[in-house]
């Protein structure tokens, strides 16, 4: 899996998972599952466009987390990204928000996001 850590003007883009998805209602950084043979960066560009309707430029890998859940074990690669085109909006998610790093802890994220959230908060 790949997730986009998109920062703009000191805020990060987060998306709330749909009610019919695993971990429904939790917040996450936009992204998703990689298809067979797909590069992580290509996966991330595709998933962000499907989920929030924006095109991103994928930068450096900033964190990775392997986390077991009741429905699956996930291996998420978090990439620093920047918006290249489009204004994010909820397409494949319930809602999107721009929040400061210090505010991320106030949102309910899946456990796999804990280390990247701590890293962002420490850097702010």
Task: Walk through the language-model features, giving the residues of each.
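Charged phosphate-binding loop/patch that engages nucleotide di/tri-phosphates or the phosphate backbone
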Residues: 112-124
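Conserved N-terminal beta-strand and adjoining loop/helix that marks the start
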Residues: 1-12, 33
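Active-site-adjacent beta-strand/loop module that shapes the phosphate/pyrophosphate-binding cleft
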Residues: 55, 64-89, 95-97, 101
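C-terminal lobe/hinge of AMP-binding adenylation domains
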Residues: 17-18
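Conserved beta-strand segments that form the floor/walls of ligand-binding pockets within enzyme
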Residues: 13, 28, 78
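The catalytic Nudix box helix
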Residues: 29-61, 100
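A conserved beta-turn-beta hairpin within the catalytic core of GNAT-like acetyltransferases
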Residues: 22-26, 98
């Amino acid at each position: 899996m790949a997730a986009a850590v998109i920062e703009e003007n000191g805020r990060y883009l987060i998306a709330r998972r749909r009610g019919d998805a695993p971990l429904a209602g939790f917040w996450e950084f936009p992204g998703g599952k990689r298809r067979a043979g797909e590069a992580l960066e290509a996966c991330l560009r595709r998933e962000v466009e499907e989920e929030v309707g924006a095109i991103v430029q994928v930068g450096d890998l900033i964190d990775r987390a392997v986390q077991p859940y009741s429905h699956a074990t996930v291996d998420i690669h978090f990439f620093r990204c920047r918006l290249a085109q489009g204004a994010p909006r909820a397409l494949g998610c319930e809602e999107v928000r721009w929040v400061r790093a210090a505010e991320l802890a106030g949102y309910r994220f899946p456990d796999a996001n804990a280390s990247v959230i701590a890293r962002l908060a420490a850097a702010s």
